[in-house]
Design a protein with these regions (language model features):
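Surface beta-strand/loop "capping" patches
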Residues: 167-218
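Conserved, mostly hydrophobic/aromatic
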Residues: 28, 136, 202, 270
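Solvent-exposed beta-hairpin/edge-strand motifs
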Residues: 216-232
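Substrate-binding cleft/loops of secretory-pathway carbohydrate-active enzymes
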Residues: 17-59, 63-105, 149-158, 186-191
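Aromatic/acidic polysaccharide-binding cleft in carbohydrate-active enzymes
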Residues: 96, 100-101, 107-168, 175-190
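Extracellular/luminal ectodomains and secreted, surface-exposed scaffolds of diverse proteins
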Residues: 191, 230-254
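Single conserved hydrophobic/aromatic residue that forms the stacking wall/gate
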Residues: 1-10
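C-terminal beta-strand-rich structural cap/linker in extracellular carbohydrate-active enzymes
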Residues: 243-275
């Protein structure tokens, strides 16, 4: 038996152990080397097709990422994994939208690094989460433990910040995806949409003064409220006659009346219950 065959046997035995000794495994995240360069390895070097076949045999429901170099056959992977950047829009393959998950870190390092200072703020992380969902994606967020096996205090602070925001805003994330194209995104906002409840969520990045303009929303909104406290927001579609204190609206536009003071949360969210 040559060296490569021994490697394949070891690999298959380890993969079999992982996929048979720990109950149902939902996801297999492969992270093999690149094919380019003098020491590059391609999908044939790793027998990537064999990995996929074995994984699907042992765990038929499993989903596998696209890092095995098998780009020709869509059956060989289930989702793509852009790392450390945010796609400009829902990623496509052959002009078709595909499932995707962005791989991100709390700081600039995947593992614990004592002297790493480029940590993302709680606000940045929440905006990243909302933007990912608004483009139909999932967010993988890495936390590297210390040599003591605990999380850095900076990571704990940010995890608590995410948890606090999610306590009242999870409905704008879980079960949500990109909004239908008929709903235009207001300025300085992000839209997420739950197709099961038919609710649209407006994540307001910059809090406007008193009014939020929604173009072409007339007849589409049943009720509006802030998610952080479930307080109702009034909205109107017509300009009050004989007043210098109200904005003009387009024929099919809606204006939501906002409190002057921004809600005291990292990212305010308006929930629209649609008609």
């Amino acid at each position: 038996v040559d060296r490569r065959q021994r490697q394949m046997c070891i690999r298959d035995s380890q993969l079999t152990e992982l996929l048979t000794e720990f109950g149902q495994i939902d996801e297999l995240f492969m992270d093999y080397t690149y094919a380019e360069g003098e020491n590059g390895k391609n999908s044939k070097d790793w027998d990537a097709e064999g990995i996929v076949k074995l994984a699907r045999k042992l765990q038929p429901q499993i989903i596998i990422n696209n890092r095995l170099g098998l780009t020709e056959n869509r059956q060989d992977w289930d989702y793509i994994t852009p790392e450390q950047f945010m796609p400009q829009q829902w990623p496509t393959v052959n002009s078709q939208r595909v499932p995707w998950e962005t791989c991100q870190t709390f700081s600039g390092s995947w593992g614990y690094h004592r002297d790493e200072y480029s940590w993302k703020s709680v606000h940045q992380l929440i905006v990243m989460l909302a933007e990912t969902v608004s483009k139909g994606g999932n967010l993988l967020l890495n936390v590297g433990p210390t040599a003591r096996g605990v999380f850095d205090e900076r990571a704990i602070e940010r995890l608590n910040g995410l948890a606090h925001w999610m306590r009242f805003h999870s409905s704008a994330i879980y079960g949500c995806t990109a909004a239908p194209t008929e709903y235009a995104c207001p300025n300085n906002c992000i839209l997420t949409y739950n197709p099961n409840t038919n609710r649209l969520y407006i994540h307001v990045l910059e809090w406007p003064f008193k009014s939020l303009y929604l173009k072409q929303y007339k007849g589409k909104i049943k009720y509006a409220q802030l998610l952080n406290d479930n307080s109702e927001l009034k909205f109107r579609t017509e300009t009050k006659k004989g007043s210098h204190m109200t904005e003009n609206t387009g024929a099919d536009d809606v204006i939501i009346t906002l409190p002057v003071e921004r809600p005291n949360v990292e990212l305010p969210v308006i929930e629209l219950i649609l008609e």
